[in-house]
Amino acid sequence: MSESGSGSERDNEPDREATPAEKVATLRSDPVLASAIDEHGILEVEPAADPFERMVTSIVNQQLSVASAAAIRERLFETAEITPEGILAADEAELRKCGLSASKVSYVKNVAEAFASGELSISDLETRSNEEIIEELTGISGIGNWTAKMALMFVFAREDVFPVEDLGIRNAIEAGYGEHTRAEMQELSTRWKPYRSLASLYLWRTVD
């Protein structure tokens, strides 16, 4: 076979998706991330096994410390069946006893109703752009930009999400890079494209 023929065949091959190690390697030019990579190894952005449970977890986590959120999640998961039907059937007073605020009880029930009614369909959203998914999710009371971005990362495994709304991310960037405004952080994040979700995983590790 001639060299030109061989090259033509290669040109027609479909693009190969980068391996987890190759994706991580693109972030190593950043010294802060390189140090986190050395410490924590290869991380991956992976879809949740249970999208509804992941959405409930994100709502519980809203504006709470890691320890407080973990304690509430543990009580909630012991008290209620974490399915749309289980949350809808759960007594509001019992959910409050788990440590959920009245507003968060309303939020998890809103999400449960959206799942149960078919208003929120993960399979339908999988084909949408990040912006379209955020618009759809934030139409549900209790889901703001932060929760929607957590869904993009941990339900849909979208690889180029930068959750500047997240306090842990902002703390990590302030400590590691000295940037203090959200606009500065957004600008900084462009160096991590197209793997800003992956970069975020490492940033969280730096402040754990």
Named regions from a protein language model:
Residues 152:
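Short glycine-enriched nucleophile-adjacent loop
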Residues 155-192:
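Phosphate-backbone recognition surface of nucleic-acid-processing proteins
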